UniProtKB/Swiss-Prot annotation:
Keyword Mitochondrion: yes
Note: Isoform Kastor and isoform Polluks are conserved only in mammals.
Gene name, Swiss-Prot/TrEMBL: MISFA
Keyword NAD (UniProt): no
Superkingdom of origin: Eukaryota
Protein name (record): Mitochondrial sheath formation-associated protein
Length: 59
């Protein structure tokens, strides 16, 4: 259980990019959030266009 907790902590630290104690409340992942949103929107648009093309073609 201790090993799983340590692995979770290290994974969280790697995800945020640094240790929480060394950073102010604005963490690096919050700075990258708009980039992630734009990627998600592009993916949704691409999927939506594919679905529309498939629907029009009758597939």
């Amino acid at each position: 259980m201790i090993v799983l907790g340590w692995m979770f902590f290290v994974g969280l630290v790697c995800y945020m990019g640094t240790f929480p104690e060394l950073m102010p409340p604005t963490l690096k992942w919050q700075e990258r959030w708009p980039v992630q949103e734009s990627k998600t929107q592009l993916r949704r648009r691409a999927l939506g266009e594919d679905l529309l093309q498939n629907h029009v073609e009758g597939i």
